[in-house]
Amino acid sequence: MATETIQVEGMSCDHCKHAVETALTELDGVSTADVSLEAGNVKVDFDDDKVTMPQMKDAIEDQGYDVK
């Protein structure tokens, strides 16, 4: 299991938080995703044998947010 914190721009409300967390947890291999609106990031616990950083970044960007 691995943990990464991904910087995300454009999140400002609970809808944003829910959209990003849901997009990530729907990926096979992601166990948890915890968005911090204040910090502008999401902490993700995942199995790096099943999911990659580019896949997670794509899932976030598909929701309309920018990944740094």
From Swiss-Prot:
Residues covered by the HMA domain: 2-68
GO cellular component: cytoplasm
Claim: Flavoprotein is one of the keywords in the record: no
Cellular compartments annotated: Cytoplasm
Record field: transmembrane: none
Record-linked SUPFAM superfamilies: HMA, heavy metal-associated domain (SSF55008)
Pfam families: HMA
UniProt binding sites for Cu cation: C13, C16
Keywords from the UniProt entry: Chaperone, Copper, Cytoplasm, Metal-binding
Main location: cytoplasm
Domain of life (superkingdom): Bacteria
Molecular function in Gene Ontology: copper ion binding
Function: Chaperone that serves for the intracellular sequestration and transport of Cu(+). Delivers Cu(+) to the copper-exporting P-type ATPase A (CopA).
PANTHER family recorded: P-TYPE CATION-TRANSPORTING ATPASE (PTHR46594:SF4)
Protein name stated in the entry: Copper chaperone CopZ
Organism: Staphylococcus saprophyticus subsp. saprophyticus (strain ATCC 15305 / DSM 20229 / NCIMB 8711 / NCTC 7292 / S-41)
